[in-house]
Amino acid sequence: MQDKSIKKIVLAYSGGLDTSAIIPWLKENYGGCEVVAFVADIGQERGDLEGVEQKALQSGASECHVVDLREEFISEYVYPVLQTGALYEGTYLLGTSMARPIIAKAQVELALKVGADALCHGATGKGNDQVRFETTYTALAPQLKVVAPWREWDLRSREALLDYLKERNIPTTASLEKIYSRDENAWHISTEGGVLESPWNAPNKDCWVWTVDPLEAPDQPEQVTIAVEKGRVVAVNGEALSPFGCLDKLNAIGARHGVGRIDIVENRLVGIKSRGCYETPGGTIMVNALRAVEQLVLDRDSFKWREQLGLEMSYVVYDGRWFAPLRKSIQASAEALAEEVNGEVVLQLYKGQVTAIQKKSANSLYSEEFATFGEDEVYDHRHAGGFIRLFSLSSRIRALNEKK
């Protein structure tokens, strides 16, 4: 049931076919309401932003606001997740999941600024993004109403959307030929649909956008040096850069070596399994650099705790609960562990692989004196016997009981 009391809606606008159709649809179905378009710049293809304001206005928006969120996205969303080591279902670096809360937060801020009484997104009724957007809306501005066109309208195909715009003389560069659904930001690009809808089909070359085929990558490996401070990448090859600057540089380096490709089937929050090809070249390099420093710095219990934090964080972020107390608690714990994660790593990139070949840290717990396989004077091997007897005591008692 469409709420005719809504007077002004802020739409999360991308300039694509769906959100271009949403603007006139909102005006027609919500009593001629005013639609303000909000565009989040989170590092997507620059061409997607060219002319986006004019496109929004031509579609019927009263205003279009483009907000640069690139640095905030990497510094305040990506880096905290990196510190936990989160990988959803062991492989996915959460590129789309991390982007939705910052988009929704900035959208809410604009809505409050312009006096809107509703928020709108273009996420479908089968995906995770509707949950992520609306959970954020509720956490930050529960008084604002939410409009989700894909759960209301009867425009169910790309052809129907194109016809809808054509009937209203609204220009669009979209065409029927689009096969794949893609999501892109500074951290990653994902590809779904098309040939990927059957898990028995191998991805073709069109399923990959950023990275070269690892088999066609350079025959000579490339080394890259990463500086890490408090679990955050701060410099690449000796050049101090902002968080976005570090990622942007590593994306370019990693992409030419075919780094960061995964092809996975994941469990969506809404109960559906979906398949996607994800490319995260710079992020994959960063993850390897951080793990290399952690190997030097974190003791066994701290490393195990960090792994548990990463597992919990992966579900919190994937499920869209960024503004929940649990995420803040996990992040605080991860930041405490990361205080000592400082160092420098040299990684070798070769045909899709990333290998840490050199690493050092002022906080390293690695001691050559204790670790040597040669003769040493700092470790008394006789001490190990007592430790083993105590460590295995419960096993000894159990075995003795079984013999009674």
UniProtKB/Swiss-Prot annotation:
Q: Which residues are noted in the entry as L-aspartate-binding?
A: 124, 128-129
Q: Which InterPro entries match?
A: Arginosuc_syn_C, Arginosuc_syn_N, Arginosuc_synth, Arginosuc_synth_CS, Arginosuc_synth_type_1_subfam, AS_cat/multimer_dom_body, Rossmann-like_a/b/a_fold
Quote a single Gene Ontology cellular component term: cytoplasm
Pathway(s):
Amino-acid biosynthesis; L-arginine biosynthesis; L-arginine from L-ornithine and carbamoyl phosphate: step 2/3
**What is the annotated localization of this protein?**
Cytoplasm
Q: Which Pfam families does the UniProt record give? A: Arginosuc_syn_C, Arginosuc_synth
Q: How does it assemble?
A: Homotetramer.
Query: What family is this?
Result: Belongs to the argininosuccinate synthase family. Type 1 subfamily.
Q: What is this protein called?
A: Argininosuccinate synthase
Natural source organism: Erwinia tasmaniensis (strain DSM 17950 / CFBP 7177 / CIP 109463 / NCPPB 4357 / Et1/99)
